[in-house]
Amino acid sequence: MIEADRLISAGATIAEDVADRAIRPKLLAEYVGQPQVRSQMEIFIQAAKRRGDALDHLLIFGPPGLGKTTLANIVANEMGVNLRTTSGPVLEKAGDLAAMLTNLEPHDVLFIDEIHRLSPVVEEVLYPAMEDYQLDIMIGEGPAARSIKIDLPPFTLIGATTRAGSLTSPLRDRFGIVQRLEFYQVPDLQHIVGRSARHMGLEMSDDGALEVARRARGTPRIANRLLRRVRDFAEVKHDGAISAEIAAQALDMLNVDAEGFDYMDRKLLLAVIDKFFGGPVGLDNLAAAIGEERETIEDVLEPYLIQQGFLQRTPRGRMATVRAWNHFGITPPEMP
């Protein structure tokens, strides 16, 4: 099993990227959630526009699916400039980045997704571009090689990453603004689901939007994916209108429970509870018990369960919390 196979995966498919583009907010006034980020960016953008400057370089980090690309689009729209988009793995050679930089207009935004995956050679080109708006290019090879400097227009680099710790210090230090996106609160997700439903022309009650939001794991991308599947269910099994009851029926059918857990989440927790009496259990034993690789458990399954307080990592192994026992209606053992 890989993360992309799961309905509640925070990763995006190409089809979802296209579908989500139509319902993304375009301006800060439409941006829901992340109140601290929103208020700070409003000030930074207004200040840059009043001075007639490019916005400082911006690093956005946080778990996948929280709207890093959306925020980059909003920044470009608010600044009234073009947005050029690429990603770390695509920029294989220094020339790839140089070509993008030399085609920028003044104050344009260059958005690099997965910026932690830039190669060292490409990263070296970014340093003078970010600091001095200059491009240092080597022409020729061997003894005949020479360096030339190309002046660049003032621009804004927006880097997005799910792994801020993987960025090198020299790159991280060149960002004047750093924003962390947090998991969304249920009321904010409910608002997002309702807005998406209206854009899709759906008849959906507030309670229906709330039911989807509760199971979306704090992630707008998951909320919109669940909404599309609930829409399918409502159109086939009912008259297309989505109430809380219909949303719950659809999500139960899709094996997404009230906490947003899918079959694999529940399988892991039940293995710890049933097979290992709540733990502690070593990672290798747990992997064998559920038929998954240890890397899948560590990187895909565990993080959300730990973050929500259903699983603990201890020096002796993984343990189910009281909250996990209660989730399945099982009485936890008495603590010695």
UniProtKB/Swiss-Prot annotation:
It holds the Pfam family AAA_lid_4. It catalyses: ATP + H2O = ADP + phosphate + H(+). The RuvA-RuvB-RuvC complex processes Holliday junction (HJ) DNA during genetic recombination and DNA repair, while the RuvA-RuvB complex plays an important role in the rescue of blocked DNA replication forks via replication fork reversal (RFR). RuvA specifically binds to HJ cruciform DNA, conferring on it an open structure. The RuvB hexamer acts as an ATP-dependent pump, pulling dsDNA into and through the RuvAB complex. RuvB forms 2 homohexamers on either side of HJ DNA bound by 1 or 2 RuvA tetramers; 4 subunits per hexamer contact DNA at a time. GO terms for cellular component: cytoplasm; Holliday junction resolvase complex. Gene3D superfamilies: 1.10.8.60, P-loop containing nucleotide triphosphate hydrolases, Winged helix-like DNA-binding domain superfamily/Winged helix DNA-binding domain. It comes from the Bacteria. This is Holliday junction branch migration complex subunit RuvB. Belongs to the RuvB family. It comes from Salmonella typhimurium (strain LT2 / SGSC1412 / ATCC 700720). SUPFAM superfamilies: P-loop containing nucleoside triphosphate hydrolases, Winged helix' DNA-binding domain. One of its GO terms (molecular function) is four-way junction DNA binding. Residues 4-184, 24-184 are annotated as: Large ATPase domain (RuvB-L). GO terms for biological process: DNA recombination; DNA repair. Has 3 domains, the large (RuvB-L) and small ATPase (RuvB-S) domains and the C-terminal head (RuvB-H) domain. The head domain binds DNA, while the ATPase domains jointly bind ATP, ADP or are empty depending on the state of the subunit in the translocation cycle. During a single DNA translocation step the structure of each domain remains the same, but their relative positions change. DNA binds at residues 294, 313, 318. Its EC number is 3.6.4.-.
